[in-house]
Amino acid sequence: MKKIILLGATGSIGTQTLAIIRENPEKFQVVALSFGRNMERGRAIIKEFKPKMVAVWHTRDRVTLEAEFPNVKFFNGLEGLREVATYLDGDVLLNAVMGSVGLLPTLDAIEAGKAIAIANKETLVTAGHLVMRAAKEKNISLLPVDSEHSAILQALNGENTERIEKIILTASGGSFRDKTREQLSAVTVKEALKHPNWNMGNKLTIDSATMFNKGLEVMEAHWLFGVDYDDIEVVIQRESIIHSMVQFVDGSFIAQLGTPDMRMPIQYALTYPDRLYIPYEKEFRITDFSALHFEKVDYERFPALKLAYNAGKIGGTMPTVLNAANEIAVAGFLNGQVAFYNIEALVENAMNRHTSISNPDLDTILQVDQETRAYVKTLL
């Protein structure tokens, strides 16, 4: 039985992870977890899964829960996340928190010898060189939970990675894939949160609409699979049936197909290289799709993706700036402070004023992250 540490238990990925664990109680046990502000859902999870250690964000929530669950050890804040991530009895850390707050717990878990299932893409975006180096030194498996990177991992099983010609990441195009740039100026938060194919959290859905999410995934793929940015291509695949593919030097392609359901990559990260049965409401039949559609990305229509490629190629602290600026800009949009159209402009502004620092250490990354957030907040 694998003992799971789950960060971000009440979020979209966390909820679907718990569904897998619920279906397979003989294979998995939740021994520690974290959640943010959703106390009602958090209480229900604690009652059902009976973790031994829990981290919440606010001190007041920790105090409240300590009175309700005297047999559980509680922590709060970032230090609480770090405590839970290194819980001695845990085998696997599944990091599903949103944002760069996931970086330090991941590094701590690697240092503690935990296997890592990574859904927090910001960890690799901001500090990929540090994370991959630490994982290599500790001989730690770093398995992707993102559907695209899980697809690449599956396509590369048994393959010689030196024979990769290109990695192709697929994208749905998000909520506004058929709108022009001019039409984006007046879109609302409600409209932006309607993703055509996937059920995701608010931040991720907005990132999908701008395609910053795909840009972060490009950087994540660069670190996970050691492929140059020029050899990572993004294509629009409207149906979200082909989750990504690899092109090899002989001209052949290997792709992973399946229903757009995050339980598939989550279970694969937890059971790799094995697979589990997943009960679906509707069986996936390839014959239900008379055609699958592919389109080139229009980088003028999706400038966020171009910004992400530029940040990745510049390297150093520039990806940290892009990520931090985007997190603040998206929060501003969700709070009604920023027009959707201006999310990319705020990120570009932050990148233009920053001179990248090469091969940054952890303290430098954290400092640049905080400085960027503070700067972008002044622009809201």
UniProtKB/Swiss-Prot annotation:
Binding annotation for Mn(2+): 146, 148, 217
Enzyme class name: oxidoreductase
Chain residues that bind 1-deoxy-D-xylulose 5-phosphate: 121, 147-148, 172, 195, 208, 213-214, 217
Coiled coil: none
Cross-referenced InterPro entries: DXP_reductoisomerase, DXP_reductoisomerase_C, DXP_reductoisomerase_N, DXPR_C, DXPR_C_sf, NAD(P)-bd_dom_sf
List of residues binding NADPH: 10-13, 36-38, 120, 122, 201
Entry's Gene Ontology BP terms: isopentenyl diphosphate biosynthetic process, methylerythritol 4-phosphate pathway involved in terpenoid biosynthetic process
Cofactor(s) this protein cannot do without: Mg(2+); Mn(2+)
GO molecular function, one term: manganese ion binding
Catalytic activity, as annotated: 2-C-methyl-D-erythritol 4-phosphate + NADP(+) = 1-deoxy-D-xylulose 5-phosphate + NADPH + H(+)
Matching Pfam families: DXP_redisom_C (PF08436), DXP_reductoisom (PF02670), DXPR_C (PF13288)
Pathway, per record: Isoprenoid biosynthesis; isopentenyl diphosphate biosynthesis via DXP pathway; isopentenyl diphosphate from 1-deoxy-D-xylulose 5-phosphate: step 1/6
EC number: 1.1.1.267
UniProt keyword terms in alphabetical order: Isoprene biosynthesis, Manganese, Metal-binding, NADP, Oxidoreductase
Family: Belongs to the DXR family.
HAMAP family, alphabetized: DXP_reductoisom
Record's function text: Catalyzes the NADPH-dependent rearrangement and reduction of 1-deoxy-D-xylulose-5-phosphate (DXP) to 2-C-methyl-D-erythritol 4-phosphate (MEP).
Name of this protein: 1-deoxy-D-xylulose 5-phosphate reductoisomerase
